[in-house]
């Protein structure tokens, strides 16, 4: 049984979406809450199972704060690590020796991909895109458009939200 066979068995048993790219490459689609989907590209080589998930594009601002967050987060991770490509886009990566691959290991690995991608996403948005988010919020409010996909950031983006919080605490 190959490492990808074990991955496919895990995906089937866990009711997780998986797409076959070719005999040595599949993509696992993990459902999240903050980051709605995390697609993990899984490639089997002679020696390892190489996994990579796109997390977020290159930040628009606060590059040092953004990068520092990623490096500090790497200290907490056991199987995965954040990486940045030549464009500055952020990925989560892991390489597992083929002989170490079991369903249990795949479960823990995919769990870490999901947990880290989901728990880091909003923090990375705020650190790297706050100016754009504020402009988007103002534009939507001024036109009566929905702010539903920005609701998680209301306290940061809506100046009126902070005023009403102050009045409530008095």
PLM features: residue spans?
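Conserved short hydrophobic interaction patches
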Residues: 10-13, 69-77, 109-123
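Short, highly charged C-terminal tails/helix-capping segments
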Residues: 125-170
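Short amphipathic alpha-helical segments
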Residues: 2-6, 58-66, 105, 109-112, ...
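Short, internal acidic amphipathic alpha-helical interface segments
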Residues: 52-93
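A contiguous, mid-protein "functional segment" used to position or interact
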Residues: 100-139
């Amino acid at each position: 049984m190959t490492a990808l066979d074990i991955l496919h068995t895990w995906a089937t048993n866990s009711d997780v979406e998986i797409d076959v790219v070719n005999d040595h490459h599949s993509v696992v689609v993990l459902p999240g809450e903050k980051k709605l989907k995390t697609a993990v590209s899984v490639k089997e080589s002679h020696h390892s199972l190489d996994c990579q998930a796109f997390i977020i594009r290159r930040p628009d601002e606060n590059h040092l704060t953004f990068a520092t967050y990623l490096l500090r987060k790497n200290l907490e991770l056991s199987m995965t690590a954040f990486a940045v490509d030549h464009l500055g886009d952020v990925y989560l990566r892991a390489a597992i020796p083929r002989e170490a691959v079991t369903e249990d290991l795949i479960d823990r690995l995919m769990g870490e991909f999901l947990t880290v991608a989901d728990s880091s996403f909003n923090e990375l948005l705020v650190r790297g895109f706050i100016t754009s988010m504020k402009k988007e919020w103002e534009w939507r409010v001024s036109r009566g458009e929905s702010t539903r996909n920005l609701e998680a950031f209301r306290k940061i983006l809506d100046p009126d939200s902070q005023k009403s919080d102050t009045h409530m605490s008095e």
